[in-house]
Amino acid sequence: MPSSVNRTSRTEPAGHHREFPLSLAAIDELVAEEEAEDARVLHLTANETVLSPRARAVLASPLTSRYLLEHLDMRGPSPARLGNLLLRGLDRIGTIEESATEVCRRLFGARYAEFRCLSGLHAMQTTFAALSRPGDTVMRVATKDGGHFLTELICRSFGRRSCTYVFDDTMTIDLERTREVVEKERPSLLFVDAMNYLFPFPIAELKAIAGDVPLVFDASHTLGLIAGGRFQDPLREGADLLQANTHKTFFGPQKGIILGNDRSLMEELGYTLSTGMVSSQHTASTVALLIALHEMWYDGREYAAQVIDNARRLAGALRDRGVPVVAEERGFTANHMFFVDTRPLGSGPAVIQRLVRAGVSANRAVAFNHLDTIRFGVQEITRRGYDHDDLDEAADLVAAVLLERQEPERIRPRVAELVGRRRTVRYTGDPASAAGPPARERYAPPTAPAGHPARPRWIGVRLTPLPEPVTEAECAGAQRLGRLAGAFPHQIDSSGNVSFTSTDGRLFVTGSGTYIKDLAPGDFVELTGAEGWTLHCRGDGPPSAEAYLHHLLRERVGARYVVHNHCIPGRALETSGALVIPPKEYGSVALAEAVADACQDSQVMYVRRHGLVFWAHSYDECLALIEDVRRITG
């Protein structure tokens, strides 16, 4: 049985002895020591970055304790809504997010942006969950060819099979042999997920092979270069989605991002996130990401060009000093990282140990068909402003360690001296962008136009008891429609709402929090009329948040049956005949009025990021509409 009493650390430096649990003062001391050592290290890892002071400061903001929920399209002004949960919102952060979405359009050519992913792996899991099903096959990059070491495991844990691209001897995908694998394995998703690579991928050619199958490019390593117009341009070259973590060449916090131009794919991803993959998106980290996006907008082109120049220069300088660098004949690299072949230098772990003793941080990586290497990256020292002289000095120090010309401990003070000269973070955005009045003066809540009464966000409800509940016979048709609509594929959940008009002309709608797949007579509330912005209702509890929508459809077109589910029709939408309505806030007057305005033109409507709405004058007509769309959507 494990013991938690009087445990001592096994990782303390010589001369230190601590007992657990630590005192808070001891924790403060350890953090301070770690930070001090970090400031003396030459960071040449390819998978880390340094934040700007502005982005780092917001991580300690009081906002870190506040919730930022849902996608921007669905959040609405404060108070924010998540289903039936209402809470004070962060409207000013929404303004920043709206600006960051525009930045993504300009930097990446992406019409849609999803900032809620907590990490790159979380983005990968979201993509797998949204765009494939258990038993499907996902095509990935094999670990031996530079693929991420967890992709295959995540495929298995999600119940997916996997197959791999075929690479040739030049670290390049063999397109013809890969085509053969695709034709044999028929993957439902092509995922380009490399973590050890030097040159662009043939995205356009892979998309030609993929056809209608989604192609997802994971740019966790090169997102900052892509933002700066370098390396490659995945979305314009044919990738359906671009996803990444945001803390390598992209100089943001440890978060994830998904970008794309296909509305249906992005909405499927958004719904997948909203239905169990994320609640809080970690407010402070999200704001730091939004800041980094703006910094990249201002300085990304200069930064990306300098990163690639520095990577090639440092690789060449090491080669000139006798260090075996991979891919010399191809110019070493086209991105931020390069690889040293450890075979002439000793085992990879031993080489890394020497570097760490000298105060140099890098990664050992087994890649390129099992080649043991040390992976170096220059994105952090580039942001620190290292110039050619600094790179030559760094090459002297690293080569001396790799080639064992000096003991690492003798090199360590020289490394610390070099690092100490370059502490300022560069590429932090246009200084003029910070000018202007403070945010509290710039922000103003939306107001109604002069002379017009303010339209409320939500309809009011006046509830009285229902003398007699709905009978089984009266609601039988609505129950059957609810079961059918609630069982659609790609369904966010089995909630939603249904209304029907009884034979004596009374309008009934499902109550708040009911599930349309298993409705009972007691789940219905009668709508007896409306007065201004208030619905008069009779029932045991409040009606659905969308009750006003049902009231308006009854008033506008005489609808006797209305069914609203939470289905994402995806790409099948184009052939379903549904009229598409832009995203509107759940339960809002704006949503109800948008649907009521559109119902004159169609009996099937899709509210983006929300679900389908059907209306009809009879049960049989509504049943036929639902069955037709269900056949189309699978």
From Swiss-Prot:
Residues 428-456 are annotated as: Disordered. Gene3D superfamilies: Aspartate Aminotransferase, domain 1, Class II aldolase/adducin N-terminal domain, Type I PLP-dependent aspartate aminotransferase-like (Major domain). Its EC number is 2.2.1.8. Coiled coil: none annotated. Its cofactor is pyridoxal 5'-phosphate. GO terms for cellular component: cytoplasm. SUPFAM superfamilies: AraD/HMP-PK domain-like, PLP-dependent transferases. This is Fluorothreonine transaldolase. It comes from Streptantibioticus cattleyicolor (Streptomyces cattleya).
